[in-house]
Amino acid sequence: MAQRISLTRYLVEQQRVDGLIPSQLRLLLEVVARACKHISHAVNKGALGGVLGSASSENVQGEIQKKLDIIANEVLIEANEWGGHLAAMASEEMDSIYVVPNRYPQGEYLLLFDPLDGSSNIDVNVSIGTIFSVLKKPEGHPGVTTEDFLQAGSSQVAAGYCIYGPQTTLVLTVGDGVAMFTLDREQGSFVLVEENVKIPADTREFAINMSNMRHWDAPVKRYIDECLAGTEGPREKDFNMRWIASMVADVHRILTRGGIFLYPWDKREPNKPGKLRLMYEANPMSWLIEQAGGAATNGKERILDIQPKQLHERVSVILGSKNEVERVTRYHSGI
């Protein structure tokens, strides 16, 4: 029987053998994984734990918060604030950054997260997840400010997500490919199930919210029309559509078997470049996709090259199988 490799062992080997990650980053990722285990337990309890339904509050995005949104956010903060690995955190659910209190030692990393992506699906028992991104705090000044977080996605030192579905699976990159770990509840630890995840360059699956078709820009509509035309159209092959309304679930499917995910700009809010959050969702997911051989753009430029101007910046997202993403990007260029 093949030896089971735990997340801890995997990270130690990444540090010791490959020299890819410093010890403080390794310890930080282990803490994030433990927090995800706690969130997984809360999600699994559902109605039995009294965690379903909406809270009486809105987040900075103006969205009604679910009870589990708040619980997951608190779990991540409480797990990470005292370890000495972080200088500050930023969350989709908080207006401003959370600086590690003076009573705890401060580290050299910044942690960003969407504590519970796809939370509109909580009450109907569809897969949801936690997305996270790790940056290095810029040197040269004491303390930490919001500006320290405003780094392009190409500056990430680690990124991943934990999906709470039929299995709880942690997906991670530290810049050397993508690895997947499934939570063994009997053992109480994440166990490596796949290394060097690769996305096929071509696909027959696309994920987009078709109900918004009338609001799309011409390049996106052209691409989807060609997919829908099937074997009789210019693509000369049939496509299937998938849409879960949970980015974690849609991206996990793409990492597992290929596909393209589109959450484009639309005409309802022309002054907004998109809906998904650049720092909490687009950057970490785009790095994972690229590390698996895929591509990620906003239709015009690589997601990881975008220089953020604000903490809660939004962006259009097209990611997945490389040849399909490049095709949509060409259409935006008028080709």
From Swiss-Prot:
Tell me where on the tree of life, at the top rank, the source sits.
Answer: Bacteria
Q: What Enzyme Commission number(s) appear in the record?
A: 3.1.3.11
Q: Which Pfam families match?
A: FBPase, FBPase_C
Q: Where does Mg(2+) 2 bind?
A: 114, 117, 281
- What keywords appear on the UniProt entry? Carbohydrate metabolism, Cytoplasm, Hydrolase, Magnesium, Metal-binding
Q: How is the cofactor bound?
A: Binds 2 magnesium ions per subunit.
Residues annotated to bind substrate: 117-120, 209, 275
Question: What GO cellular component is one of the record's annotations?
Answer: cytosol
Task: Report the record's Gene Ontology biological process terms.
Answer: fructose 1,6-bisphosphate metabolic process; fructose 6-phosphate metabolic process; fructose metabolic process; gluconeogenesis; sucrose biosynthetic process
Under the heading InterPro entries, the entry gives: FBPase_C_dom, FBPase_class-1, FBPase_N, FBPtase
Citing just one GO molecular function, the answer is: magnesium ion binding
The annotated pathway is: Carbohydrate biosynthesis; gluconeogenesis
Q: Which cofactor(s) does the record list?
A: Mg(2+)
Q: What class of enzyme is it?
A: hydrolase
> What does the record give as the reaction this protein catalyses?
beta-D-fructose 1,6-bisphosphate + H2O = beta-D-fructose 6-phosphate + phosphate
Q: Where in the cell is it found?
A: Cytoplasm
| Chain sites annotated for binding Mg(2+) 1 | 92, 114, 116
Kindly report the protein's main subcellular placement as a broad class: cytoplasm
Query: Which SUPFAM superfamilies does this one have?
Result: Carbohydrate phosphatase
Listed HAMAP family: FBPase_class1
Homology family: Belongs to the FBPase class 1 family.
Subunit comment for this entry?
Homotetramer.
NCBIfam families from the xrefs?
PRK09293.1-1 (NF006778), PRK09293.1-3 (NF006779), PRK09293.1-4 (NF006780)
- Protein name in the entry: Fructose-1,6-bisphosphatase class 1
Lineage start: Bacteria, Pseudomonadati, Pseudomonadota, Betaproteobacteria, Burkholderiales
